[in-house]
């Protein structure tokens, strides 16, 4: 059986490989090449070297979007994972209605980002309207609006991952710790957290990448207003590419830089948390 699988593996893998090459590899390579070109369409691309990259770092809107995105990512990763872990701990204590609460917390994750953005825009503007403010009055309003939206959407999904991990902790291990006189805090710090570190790695990776590449919620909630001060990187790239004639190459260069930043941060985070797993 194993020999037959090895024999026909290339036949079954080839369609997937071809689709992956056409749908990802070729566009990715073309995107890198176009980041060194001036163009309005891919057929009139003119190579200009590093000019586009120099224009990227001289563009104040990009640098502001980078710092805004970095701050948003830090806050959202921390809040989402803390809330998700706390809720998961509560829902694994055997309280009544656990399945109902799991469903309720998970449901927002099923709603599309653009829809969520408009829903929360209406809700938050309705609340702020009582104080003569809107989400676009200040970038800080937009920032915390995005944090609330992202938490509401993502906490339920991360909660499910944490619940599965907590339920897999051997009961004998917890009982042994209690018999040794471990307090609730010691039990959490020395048993629960080390045992769920693989889930912490996964959830941190997912929230980090989702936060950094956030686009549709940003577009729907604030559209970068006021004056692009609540604009995140993905939206900045979109508006550079499609909203500024002659800047298509710069937009592509921004996209390449964006990819590198996300890849480096995600790999570093993944390696760091996996190291913690080994140490534990």
Regions found by a protein language model. Name each.
Residues 2-280:
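A structural signal for multi-pass alpha-helical bundles of membrane permease subunits
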């Amino acid at each position: 059986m194993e020999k037959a699988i090895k024999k026909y593996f290339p036949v079954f893998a080839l369609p997937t490989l071809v689709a992956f090459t056409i749908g990802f590899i070729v566009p990715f390579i073309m995107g890198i090449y176009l980041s060194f070109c001036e163009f309005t369409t891919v057929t009139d691309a003119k190579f200009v070297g590093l000019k586009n990259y120099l224009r990227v770092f001289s563009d104040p809107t990009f640098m502001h979007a980078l710092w805004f995105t970095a701050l948003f990512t830090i806050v959202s990763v921390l809040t989402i994972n803390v809330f998700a872990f706390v809720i998961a701990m509560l829902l694994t204590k055997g309280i009544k209605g656990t399945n109902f609460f799991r469903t309720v917390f998970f449901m927002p994750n099923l709603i599309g980002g653009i829809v969520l953005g408009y829903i929360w825009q209406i809700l938050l503007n309705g609340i702020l309207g009582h104080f003569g403010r809107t989400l676009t009055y200040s970038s800080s309003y937009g920032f915390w609006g995005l944090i609330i939206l992202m938490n509401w959407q993502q906490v339920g999904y991360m909660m499910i991952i944490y619940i599965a991990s907590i339920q897999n902790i051997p009961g004998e291990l917890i009982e042994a710790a209690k018999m040794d006189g471990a307090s609730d805090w010691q039990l959490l710090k020395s048993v629960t957290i080390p045992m769920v570190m693989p889930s912490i790695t996964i959830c941190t990776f997912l929230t980090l990448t989702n936060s950094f590449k956030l686009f549709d919620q940003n577009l729907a909630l604030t559209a970068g207003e006021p004056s692009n001060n609540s604009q995140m990187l993905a939206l900045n790239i979109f508006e550079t590419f499609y909203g500024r004639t002659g800047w298509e190459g710069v937009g592509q260069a921004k996209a390449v830089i964006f990819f590198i930043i996300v890849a480096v941060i995600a790999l570093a985070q993944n390696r760091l948390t996996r190291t913690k797993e080994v140490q534990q």
